[in-house]
Design a protein with these regions (language model features):
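Nudix hydrolase/Nudix homology domain
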Residues: 60, 72, 101-204
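A glycine-rich, hydrophobic loop/mini-helix early in the fold
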Residues: 34-69
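Residues that flank catalytic or metal-binding motifs in active/ligand-binding sites
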Residues: 4, 33-35, 66, 97, ...
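The catalytic Nudix box helix
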Residues: 47-48, 63-99, 121
């Protein structure tokens, strides 16, 4: 069985090493590289998911469409497309960089810590209905973006990273279709080169 590893980074996003994903999330979680993705359709709806109830971090919590970790040496955009396929059965053709410099740290009630440099991407998808993988996602629903935005702004229960991301995304404008692209020069250093984040995989 192949051990899934995450990339450990410093504050600037320089690679420090790797660690098994199964051991990285503790009460002293080191800073590591991750990503978040928001899937939109042409009707300005966003795919909102509920995390599987057996997950070790924030089980059963409502959150954005998809999250994950690129493996050592894996292109960041490819990692986003890989997780969309694995978690939601979505075969997307490309990604759009939205928040290149997003970083967060959050602590669960049991003391387990999330501590990530976590660039945020957007994907437009109008294909077949998503097929959530029950190992990762307990449900997935299309929700009008403005409705979800209001829910979060009014204190609705969502994951801590989703709440912080939504505050930043709200500043980009009312319609996701009109948001400006993020500045790739603000990405963590380890994935700043276009060959390290622009996806090489495509379903198109």
């Amino acid at each position: 069985m192949v051990t899934e590893e995450v990339v450990l980074v410093d504050d600037a996003g320089r690679k420090l090493g790797t660690q098994a994903k199964s051991t990285v999330h503790t009460t002293t979680t080191p800073l590591h590289l991750a990503f978040s993705c928001y899937v939109f359709n042409s009707k300005d709806e966003v795919l909102v998911t509920e995390r599987a109830h057996h997950k070790s971090t924030w089980p059963g919590v409502t959150t954005n469409s998809c999250c994950g970790h690129p493996g050592p040496g894996e292109n960041l955009g490819d990692a986003v497309l890989r997780r969309l396929s694995q978690e939601l059965g979505i075969e997307a053709g490309g990604v759009r960089l939205l928040l290149p410099d997003f970083r967060y740290r959050a602590v669960m009630e049991n003391g387990i810590v999330e501590n990530e440099l976590c660039p945020v991407f957007g994907v437009v998808y109008d294909g077949p209905a998503p097929k959530p993988n029950p190992e990762e996602v307990s449900r997935a629903d299309w929700v009008p973006w403005q409705q979800f935005s209001r829910l979060v702004a009014e204190g609705g229960a969502v994951s801590p990273w989703c709440r912080e991301q939504m505050e930043r995304l709200h500043e980009l404008g009312e319609s996701p279709a009109r948001w400006p692209a993020g500045d790739p020069d603000a990405l963590p250093i380890v994935v700043r080169d276009p060959q390290q984040w622009q996806p090489t995989l495509s379903s198109e």
